[in-house]
Amino acid sequence: MKDCLMSLKIRKNKSPIIITLLLILALFTGLTAGYFSAHGITENGKFEAFSGKVFQNEVSGSTLTLHYTLAHPEKQGIRRKKASLGTVPTDMKNTYQICSQYEKKLKSFRYSRLSTENQLTLDSMLLYYHTEKSLGDNYLLQEPLGPSLGIQAQLPVLLAEYAFYEERDITDYLTLLTTIRPYFRSILEFEKKKSEAGFFMSDTTLDRILEQCSSFIRNPDSSYMLNIFQKKLSEYGKLPSSEQNALLLAHQNLMKTEVIPAYQELMTGLEALRGTGKNTRGLTYFKGGKAYYLYLLQSQTGSYVPVKQMEKRLSRQLSDEIGIAGTILRQNPELLTTLSRGITFREIKPAQMLNALQQKIQTDFPPLTDVTFELRTVHDSMKEYLSPAFYLTPPMDTGTPNVIYINPAANYQGLELFTTLAHEGFPGHLYQTVTFQRQKSSNIRNLLCTSGFAEGWATYIEPYAYQYAADYIQDPSATELARISWLNRSINLCMYSLLDIEIHYNGWTQAEAASFLKAFGIEDSAVVSEIYQYILETPGNYLKYYWGYLSLLDLRTSEQNRLGQDFDLKAFHSQVLKIGGVQFPVLEKYIDAEF
């Protein structure tokens, strides 16, 4: 699964891009001073200069964002600041002012004089900043922490995967470790404001976050960050052993004096707020909760469809797919026996799966030539923190390496591994990312987070992956087994997406959620409780995947109806990939545009 920084399954909630007021004043003073003078500069030139300046300012606002976006920022004319994680703002006034200034400037361009590609970029930027501003007074409902997707859970992974391209990266990494404590202090200030406003997390969620933190700091001398740092230093290969040893000691000391104490301080600060979170149900029970949920859906899924319409579409999809699955099983009752016993899959290694997928997808998707990938196994010390597989997005200035990590702890094999590698690799995240990077689109588009498109695409390709996998299923009913396996996954994702809306928008209690799940054979109280709690803690997360998938599916159906016999599936996929990650209204607008 792909994020703005990397395709990790452990992900933070997106927060608005924040730039200092000083930079904004400098930018807009530059505009009025004639930086974008009309003398000899076309409207396209002015817009590209503006979006380029915005990119430079925003990408340099965070060391992590800069590093994961550009391996060598100096070559792009971007000077690195002192490494820092920054702070979490407790007042969004400046952020909204910036969004308004951006909106005003974007609306000032002569739209008709822009190229189609620049019009698309402008549309996406305008919608992005308008959506961020719509958060309004509900910003305290944002939650940077979480047991699985919170920043305190993701940060160690982001730091562990911090690549060393040059010696400066090593010193920046070590400096970042010293900024965790002030960063966490800013989070605690934010959490205190949430508590005062009545928006603090429930004690159940607090316990789960504290357990995650405890797990990370429990054995500091055997932390996976120590092992990974040593491995990266060795692979960097440009430092003498004496200097490496000195860096290893320095790193170990920073872990004990900075990182571990920062987590301990965070835990102590959160514990002091225990009991102040009174709501144990969905967002709708908070003041402004429904409006905040609408913001989440728009910003995370990239869709602006009304919630009730989403609910109806999901219900129809769930009903349709249950009906299809029932028909298949009635016609092939032996499939149930095979499924309960386990599908027999031909022995094939992960690299062979990815190589085979590159060939098989060419029936339905445009070919992607001259692309390389690396398969890596998740380090033993990181197994419990990472998902079964993930794609690590390369910096935009290098385009490499394209790395897919496999976590042996998940023990994915056969059909499950094949389709997971398709989701992360071909024609999923890796394929979509490389295709878009080769378009050489405006740099700013790499920062406009469009999770709904990215995860929607990687889910949209899964039914094709199950279809390709049928060639490796050792059973006379291979095609039917592959189809019913996809339907099972789709039904589950649809079911959880519906629950997300019911819990956070319509206010379902755990008892109501349990009644719904019982209809699908899920009755174990512990399982029901875990599903309910996970959705409480990650509002909108399932919808990024499944509503994104349905949005692409419905767009394809619309194009089929519009073009009739002239519809070409591969051409449709090519156009979607060419447009790249945008909000769905923008995708729909440009689906038949010429670039």
Please place each PLM-identified region on the residue numbering:
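N-terminal maturation segment of proteins
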Residues: 5-595
